[in-house]
């Protein structure tokens, strides 16, 4: 009996230690970003930094306004979500409820392959195929634009949304569907009015993963967006928060480097706010 209790205590201690490591890593990253990012904000001014419309970090009279980056990231992420979530969600319903077994194996393999493709490959294909296509189709001077970035991001978030949504839908107890069918509902009504609402927390988690992937992507975006610090427009070259950091960090110094850490802090806070909002709405729905 004592040996069993000792073993349980050891296992509990190991899991506690591993959990503390995870929490500690998050705290270290948070503290580091705050310590590194706040000096630039205090020097530039919070209002000028967040709402300034011009970024010229290497000019003689440097300007550090990141409003174009914030708006571009918001528009780009929202655009990717508007495209990626419906496609990913409906694909997940098809995979979990409708698809024949042989076809499901093929589709799941394709989704897994899509998830494993490196970001630079997405960017390369987008740069060689999508960007010229947009230029020819819409008769614009340069296809490297916000639209190209939205399309690439929408494709990149599909695997996360599909996989997590499929897992959530398959976790719904079969008794729910059996009861619905017994009451005379069709299969389609059962899937969308019973199974989907029951799996809404998992589907919401899939959406958050997609948002996080879209907000945090840099390599593919920098290859198809043009990476110009303009105010966002669908057919103009733009720069995201992530690409601003990635494109300038290698040669930055002084206030410019501090400002890049401030951008990273803003991006980090965006992710925290999105997660907090999701948890709030899920808890409210559960209570309601």
Segments predicted by a language model, with ranges:
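Transmembrane alpha-helix signature in integral membrane proteins
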Residues: 66-94
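C-terminal transmembrane helix and the adjacent membrane-cytosol boundary/short C-terminal tail
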Residues: 166-170, 174, 181, 250-288
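Interhelical loop and adjacent transmembrane-helix boundary motif
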Residues: 221-267
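Transmembrane alpha-helical segments of polytopic membrane transport and secretion proteins
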Residues: 1-19, 278-288
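Glycine/proline-centered hinge or cleavage motifs at structural transition points of membrane proteins
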Residues: 118, 183-184, 197
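Generic hydrophobic transmembrane alpha-helix motif, especially the helices
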Residues: 112-154
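Cytoplasmic-entry segments and transmembrane alpha-helices of multi-pass inner-membrane transporters
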Residues: 12, 87-126, 288
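Transmembrane alpha-helices
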Residues: 164-165, 187-222
């Amino acid at each position: 009996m004592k040996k069993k209790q000792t073993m349980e205590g050891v296992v509990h201690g190991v899991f506690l230690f591993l959990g503390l490591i995870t929490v500690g890593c998050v705290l270290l990253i948070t503290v580091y970003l705050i310590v590194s990012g706040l000096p630039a904000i205090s020097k530039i001014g919070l209002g000028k930094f967040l709402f300034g419309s011009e970024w010229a970090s290497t000019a003689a009279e440097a300007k550090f306004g990141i409003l174009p980056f914030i708006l571009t990231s918001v528009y780009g992420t929202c655009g990717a979500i508007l495209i990626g979530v419906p496609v990913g969600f409906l694909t997940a319903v098809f995979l979990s409820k409708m698809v024949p077994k042989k076809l499901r194996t093929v589709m799941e393999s394709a989704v897994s392959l899509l998830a494993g493709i490196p970001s630079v490959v997405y960017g390369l294909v987008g740069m060689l195929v999508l960007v010229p296509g947009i230029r020819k189709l819409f008769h614009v001077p340069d296809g490297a634009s916000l639209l190209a970035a939205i399309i690439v991001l929408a494709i990149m978030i599909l695997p996360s949304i599909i996989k997590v949504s499929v897992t959530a839908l398959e976790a719904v107890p079969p008794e729910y569907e059996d009861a619905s069918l017994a009451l005379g509902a069709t299969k389609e009504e059962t899937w969308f009015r019973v199974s989907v609402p029951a799996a809404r927390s998992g589907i919401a988690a899939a959406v958050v993963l997609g948002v996080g992937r879209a907000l945090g992507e840099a390599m593919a975006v920098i290859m198809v967006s043009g990476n110009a610090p303009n105010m966002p427009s669908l057919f103009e070259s733009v720069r995201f928060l992530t690409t601003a950091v990635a494109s300038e960090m290698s040669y930055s110094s002084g206030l410019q480097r501090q400002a890049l850490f401030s951008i990273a802090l803003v991006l980090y806070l965006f992710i925290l706010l999105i997660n907090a909002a999701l948890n709030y709405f899920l808890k409210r729905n559960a209570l309601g």
